Design a protein with these regions (language model features):
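Short hydrophobic/charged patches on amphipathic alpha-helices used for structural packing
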Residues: 9, 187-191, 231
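Glycine/serine-rich phosphate-binding loop and adjoining beta1-alpha1 elements at the start
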Residues: 22, 26-102, 169, 177, ...
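Beta1-alpha1 glycine-rich phosphate/pyrophosphate-binding loop at the start
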Residues: 27-39, 48-50, 72, 77-82, ...
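A short, basic/flexible loop-to-alpha-helix module at the beginning of a structural domain
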Residues: 93-111, 223-237
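Feature captures the FAD/FMN-dependent oxidoreductase FAD-binding
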Residues: 105, 110-114, 162-212, 296-304, ...
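Short acidic loop-to-helix transition motifs that present clustered carboxylates
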Residues: 180-185, 225-229, 271-272
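Glycine/Thr-rich phosphate-binding loops of Rossmann-like dinucleotide-binding domains
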Residues: 207-210, 230, 273, 313, ...
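FAD-site-proximal beta/loop scaffold in flavoenzymes
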Residues: 216-236, 318, 326-360
Length: 360
């Protein structure tokens, strides 16, 4: 690993106009981080990455690098881009356990963070360092949100999140696990108890339904529910995954690791929403892909569907008669939305047309 990242760092051209940085959603100064690492200043590189993004080590594993930093690297136009994800992971993983960030004086003001997913963790770190008294309210047993309960271990080791929890506590952040705001406690209760600001970052845990017959049958499940704890599901030997995003890839690859013999992914179109890398990994694991598949109903024995043909612009040119695909179980992975528990129990909050918290 060390030799690999050193060699990758040496490949960086240090462009005057670094396209890799432009491709990063948070404008990470990639050339500077690489140069610090290459010249033996790994600690400074780790500090720089952490200051720009407290979740640097996590992003090094789960970001869509091929569309962002690495996808914009000029070396990728004629060959392989600099694999900054590997460099970032090597630097940030080493830095995480012994970081000593500067802290502002205590302000004596309470802030509540509802949800400990990526947004909740990040804003908790930023506010705690600015002197606020931060409390995280997490509905599940451990922090992480979708990072822990929606991404498989083989993509993001849970031990990294356990290390983050230690760092949060080290910063003076209080964590209340197994506390879902909107049940026993509400946002109104938090305001009553002196929290001067409340950040709601509860994620999108409500699966999107397909609205087809058979969706409520006992062998049909949703991706976001399955990924929370795959070990409690008995999927049989033949699984159909409906959907073609990264979550669908996570489901398919996890199911194979849990003993399912055959996994088939149904894609509505002739390309996938998942990253090329994740699709390649899924194919390498043995997942089979079927394109132009439009499920019409689910039965105890499998999925009925219509096969569509499309032109280059994505317009449907023909639709087949209904056909049958046998399987022992189905997992639907087409999207998720936000739950309305907090909005429905809080005075003055409203939902947007997209099912999210309405803001100014």
């Amino acid at each position: 690993m060390a030799i690999h990242v050193v060699n990758e760092a040496r490949r960086c051209l240090h462009c005057k106009k670094p396209m890799c940085r432009e491709g990063c959603p948070i404008s990470t100064n990639i050339p500077e981080a690489i140069e610090l690492f290459r010249t033996g200043h790994k600690e400074e590189a780790g500090e720089m990455l952490y200051e720009n993004n407290p979740l640097s080590v996590i992003c090094s594993l789960v970001c869509d690098h091929e569309k962002q930093c690495e996808g914009h690297c000029v070396l990728g136009r004629k060959g392989a881009p600099v694999h900054f994800s590997s460099i970032e992971n090597y630097i940030s993983d080493a830095y995480l356990d012994h970081l000593e960030p500067e802290m502002d004086p205590k302000k004596g003001q309470r802030v509540a963070i509802i949800g400990s997913g990526p947004a909740g963790i990040t804003i908790s770190v930023l506010l705690a360092r600015r002197g606020y008294d931060v409390t995280i309210f997490e509905s599940r047993e451990k922090i992480g949100g979708v990072l822990r309960y929606g991404i498989p271990e083989f993509r993001l080791p849970k031990s990294i999140l356990d290390r983050y929890q230690k760092q949060l506590i080290k910063l003076g952040i209080k964590i209340r696990p197994n506390t879902a705001i909107g049940r026993t406690l509400t946002v109104d209760d938090l305001q009553r108890d002196g929290y001067e600001a409340i950040f709601i970052g509860t994620g999108v845990w409500k699966p999107k339904a397909m609205g087809i017959p058979g969706e409520s049958l006992g062998h049909v499940n949703y991706a976001i529910d399955y990924l929370v704890d795959p070990d409690v599901y008995d999927l049989g030997d033949n699984l159909v995954v409906i959907g073609a995003g990264n979550s669908a890839m996570d489901v398919a690859r996890t199911a194979l690791r849990k003993g399912v013999r055959h996994v088939s992914v149904f894609c509505r179109r002739y390309q996938t929403a998942a990253s090329v890398r994740e699709v390649d990994y899924a194919k390498a694991d043995g997942v089979e892909f079927y394109y132009g598949m439009r499920p019409t109903r689910i039965t105890d024995d499998g999925v009925y569907y219509k096969k569509v043909e499309m032109d280059e612009e994505g317009n449907i040119t023909s639709t087949s008669e209904e056909q049958f695909f046998p399987c022992s179980s189905v997992i639907i992975a087409i999207s998720q939305g936000a739950q309305n528990r907090i909005v429905s129990t809080t005075t003055g909050l409203e939902m947007s047309s997209h099912g999210l918290l309405a803001t100014d």
